[in-house]
């Protein structure tokens, strides 16, 4: 008997999505993935610097790609759906500037 008390069959209810996220370095990768994983319902987030794409696994009952995109934009990275505020973007380290 495994401790199933707080867990659900989330993997069966989860969905995958890919969308573009602009960034330029490993610091960007860390920031982008941290922002995505900070959204309740995100199970995994992997951003690829070369393709500029993020692969997400999430629980659609708890969040949506749009909500995750907004969280990423709030930390300074443009996505297919949302543009980061210029003031936030300007505060990124120089190596993270992609515009």
Language-model features: where?
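Short, surface-exposed ligand-recognition loops at beta-strand->loop->(often short) alpha-helix junctions
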Residues: 19-28
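Short amphipathic alpha-helices in soluble, non-transmembrane regions
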Residues: 32-33, 67-76
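Helix N-cap motif at beta-to-alpha junctions
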Residues: 59-65
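Conserved short beta-strand edge segments in small beta-sheet-based binding/regulatory domains
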Residues: 76-88
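Short, low-order "capping/linker" segments at domain edges
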Residues: 90-99
């Amino acid at each position: 008997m495994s401790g199933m008390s707080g867990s659900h069959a989330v993997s069966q209810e989860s969905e995958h999505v890919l969308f573009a996220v602009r960034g330029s370095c490993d610091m960007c990768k860390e920031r982008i993935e941290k922002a995505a994983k900070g959204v309740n319902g995100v199970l995994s987030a992997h951003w690829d610097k070369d393709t500029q794409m993020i692969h997400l696994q999430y629980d659609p009952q708890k969040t949506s790609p749009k909500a995750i995109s907004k969280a990423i934009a709030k930390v300074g990275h443009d996505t297919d759906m949302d543009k980061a505020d210029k003031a936030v973007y300007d505060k990124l380290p120089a190596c993270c500037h992609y515009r």
